[in-house]
Amino acid sequence: MNRLSAHIGYLYTDLPLAERPAAAARDGFTAIEHPEPWALPAKEMRALLADLGLTFSQVTSGMGDAGKGEKGLAALTGRETEFRAGFDRALDYAVAIGCPFVHPMAGVPKGGVLDAAETYRLNLSWALSRVEGSGVRVLVEAITIPGYHMGSLALAAQLHDQFHGRFDLLFDTYHATVLAEDPARWAAQNARRIGHVHIADHPGRHEPGTGALAFDRILTALRDHGYVGAIGFEYVPSVATSASAAFLPGWKRLLSEKVSS
């Protein structure tokens, strides 16, 4: 069955970072993820994961200056040295804790579009060479933040083809819907490209069941087209996190039925 991954940057934020993995395990999640878990040294994180029977799904590299709304460094011309240092830090952490993916966020470039595109391609190429032999793969995600360089699922898929599938896509149901895509249809057509999934309902970006998305269709599309990776929950809880996760038993039953059918 697919691992169900709690994004502990969004969930359990009332708790210290070190206490969030245990809370996720108690509520029935089988994996966790966080963009910048550096406050917990890799040795401590690995021990926590082993004790709780969890895996770590994906980590982000090079977020840049959050106060300036950079949202990543990969497409920011002139920041290549900082990008590489951040990527190496994330890759080392991922290898140490057995995490399969690093997501180098593209960011919100301030310069020309062509310069940003060239910088992004060069940084992505460098990152792909860096992960060779590590057991870790690179993720690329289309994100609907205004000005974000990788803001199109079509562009992400095109880039995936141009790089001959050397990285995987992070598919987010909320962002897909904002981009006027049918998440189930897109997942069916592109499942071979997907390495990780993020779940949030739309509108509102809250837990499943609070919006209009037909998650049964989305899960069926992923299942029928061979997706076996983790399903991450990157939503803003509309209630306390544990209460918001009440859907988990039903999702586990659904996924178990689909796997056994």
Functional labels for PLM-detected ranges:
Residues M1-G28, W38, A50, G98-P100, ...:
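Histidine-acidic metal/acid-base catalytic patches
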Residues L4, I32, F56, V138, ...:
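Hydrophobic anchor at the start of a short beta-strand
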Residues H7-I8, A31-E33, L76-R79, V113-D115, ...:
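Short, contiguous strand/loop micro-motifs
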Residues L15, A22, T30-T119, F233, ...:
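Structural motif corresponding to the early beta-alpha repeats
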Residues L73-D168, K258-S260:
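Active-site acidic/histidine proton-transfer and metal-coordination neighborhood
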